[in-house]
């Protein structure tokens, strides 16, 4: 559970959680529309560039901003398999499946400043966009929320102040 990766307020020990958003210019989506192969290449490259920007930002946070890994020196293979401390789950992925989190992150980060807009369902535009959270906890590992039971969905919706049906839409549960 993501909340296990942050110290409780009652501990009296400060802790930090990061929020991030990254995207590639929306104009990239219109390139080579008449050539499906080149268009697919541009889309794929755009997705990878958005992820790479996020990876670089996460490295900066680990080494400089939060400084908990100042001496980190990973080889490219180790970097690619994420042999560093901390995780950065992205919204919509198994560790953070609730698409409505995008609206909270948008309120916090004002993502339109970098060109990201949200649909009514919380999907991001341009498609080559990613946002999520950063955790520095030494034991943090990616996990999958898994199948959400009806009782869990009802409890989560109640705690989020939303209807069960609304949360079902955002969780695709």
PLM regions and their residue ranges:
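Compositionally biased, low-complexity/repeat regions
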Residues: 8, 59-158, 164-165, 169-172
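ATP-dependent carboxylate/acyl-activation modules
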Residues: 10-70
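Electropositive phosphate-/nucleotide-binding environments in soluble metabolic enzymes
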Residues: 43, 47, 51, 150, ...
């Amino acid at each position: 559970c993501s909340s296990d990766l942050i110290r409780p307020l009652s501990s009296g020990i400060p802790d930090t959680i990061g929020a991030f958003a990254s995207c590639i210019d929306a104009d990239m989506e219109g390139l080579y529309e008449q050539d499906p192969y080149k268009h697919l290449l541009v889309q794929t490259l755009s997705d990878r560039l958005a992820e790479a920007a996020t990876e670089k930002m996460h490295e900066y946070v680990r080494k400089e901003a939060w400084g908990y890994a100042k001496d980190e020196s990973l080889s490219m293979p180790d970097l690619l398999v994420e042999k560093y401390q901390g995780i950065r789950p992205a919204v919509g992925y198994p560790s953070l499946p609730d698409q409505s989190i995008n609206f909270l992150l948008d309120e916090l980060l004002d993502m339109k400043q970098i060109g990201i807009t949200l649909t009514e369902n919380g999907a991001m535009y341009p498609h080559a966009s990613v946002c999520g959270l950063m955790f520095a906890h030494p034991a943090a590992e990616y996990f999958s929320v898994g199948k959400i039971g009806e009782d869990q969905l009802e409890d989560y919706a109640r705690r989020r102040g939303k209807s069960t049906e609304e949360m079902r839409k955002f969780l695709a549960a």
